[in-house]
Amino acid sequence: MLSPVTAKDKKSFIQWFLNHYRLKKRESVWILNYLVNHSDLLANVHFVRDVKYCPRGIMMTSHCSDEVPFRFYKNHLVTTDAEKSFHDIRLNQNESLYVQLNFRKSNQHSYYASVLEENPFIPEDYYLTTDDKETANGLLDYLLFEQKRNKIIFDIDKALDNGDKELFQKLSEKLEKLSSNRQK
């Protein structure tokens, strides 16, 4: 498990970010500066990807990104009003706030990666495509088939070793039925 990101690291990153990127909404700068100046608040700030899944999150975008300038998410409601979100942040300082910053090549940036945390609210199958699910189901079906087949073959060998023709015949039919069902 990754060690938690310290408030000091978050503060340092935000300051660096503000010095290197220009945000599309000036209110975003106010919010980030507010976070920097309130260290106790930074303990509840978590940098994540896909903030839209979080119960309380904010997405801010720099000019070098094509993403929307600003979004604030709270309990499945979305607003683009940065002042309302700033008010919410000030009033609810003890609640976790999840922050997503959009800027050029953010997914490749090591400094951003150092403060990024795993988003605990992303659905388990979020990163799976339909093809991935079909491939996984096919593999699972194949593995179950192989396990059943190997068990029957093992039991057939055992029946042969024991000279049990009746059990051998029964298991051979079972194996044939299993194989023909697999081919359908």
From Swiss-Prot:
Gene3D superfamilies: Uncharacterised family UPF0302, N-terminal domain, Virus Scaffolding Protein, Chain A. Disulfide bonds: none annotated. It holds the Pfam family UPF0302. HAMAP family: UPF0302. Belongs to the UPF0302 family. This is UPF0302 protein OB1778.
